[in-house]
Amino acid sequence: MTAQLEGLRIGNGQKHCVIVSKFNEFITESLLKGAKDAYRQHGVAESDVTVIYVPGAFELPQTVKRVLGSKKYQFSAIVCLGAVIRGATSHYDLVSGEAAKVGSVADGSVPVIFGVITTESIEQAIERAGTKAGNKGYEAATTAIEMANLFKEIG
């Protein structure tokens, strides 16, 4: 029989880090609220969630790298939340490209989840932060719980 491994969505005893971009805060605060809702619903204690605010999505990868190297903080998973909305310049491409590097700085010790929404308009961002298209912060947090359990199972 083929062995199958799958992480469960049970967060009891897990410690999570959420790194949140302050830029487009009206969107990222909704994403953070969604993440906190997911943690609560899946058994992660509020005291086991550490939120780190960074200026923008561009700063997410370097902050992930710093958290992973920290001796002070140890987490079951890290979630990165941000909102990059296309404007009239090429800045969108630069920032969204840099934000997407969060996975490349991960060292494999804990899951690093990309919860940054990249949209063409403010309306799309609002939809993905909890109105029509669900809440991507909630989805990122449940993915983090599941992946933390999977990493633990893999050993």
Curated annotation (Swiss-Prot):
Respond yes or no to whether keyword S-adenosyl-L-methionine is given for this record. no
Query: Taxonomically, which superkingdom?
Result: Bacteria
Top EC group: transferase
- One GO CC term on file: riboflavin synthase complex
Q: Pfam families from the xrefs?
A: DMRL_synthase
- Disulphide bond pairs: none
Q: Example GO biological process term?
A: riboflavin biosynthetic process
Please provide, alphabetically and separated by semicolons, the GO molecular function terms listed in this UniProt record. Answer: 6,7-dimethyl-8-ribityllumazine synthase activity
| Residues that hold (2S)-2-hydroxy-3-oxobutyl phosphate according to the record | 88-89, 128
EC number in record: 2.5.1.78
Give the reactions, separated by semicolons, that this protein catalyses. Answer: (2S)-2-hydroxy-3-oxobutyl phosphate + 5-amino-6-(D-ribitylamino)uracil = 6,7-dimethyl-8-(1-D-ribityl)lumazine + phosphate + 2 H2O + H(+)
SUPFAM superfamilies, sorted: Lumazine synthase (SSF52121)
Keywords, alphabetical: Riboflavin biosynthesis, Transferase
Give binding positions for 5-amino-6-(D-ribitylamino)uracil: 23, 57-59, 83-85, 114
User: Is Transferase there in the keyword field?
Assistant: yes
Q: In which pathway does it act?
A: Cofactor biosynthesis; riboflavin biosynthesis; riboflavin from 2-hydroxy-3-oxobutyl phosphate and 5-amino-6-(D-ribitylamino)uracil: step 1/2
Q: Where is the active site?
A: 91 (proton donor)
In the record, the note on similarity to other proteins reads:
Belongs to the DMRL synthase family.
The record's function comment reads: Catalyzes the formation of 6,7-dimethyl-8-ribityllumazine by condensation of 5-amino-6-(D-ribitylamino)uracil with 3,4-dihydroxy-2-butanone 4-phosphate. This is the penultimate step in the biosynthesis of riboflavin.
Name of the protein described by the UniProt record? 6,7-dimethyl-8-ribityllumazine synthase
Q: Which organism is it from?
A: Leptospira biflexa serovar Patoc (strain Patoc 1 / ATCC 23582 / Paris)
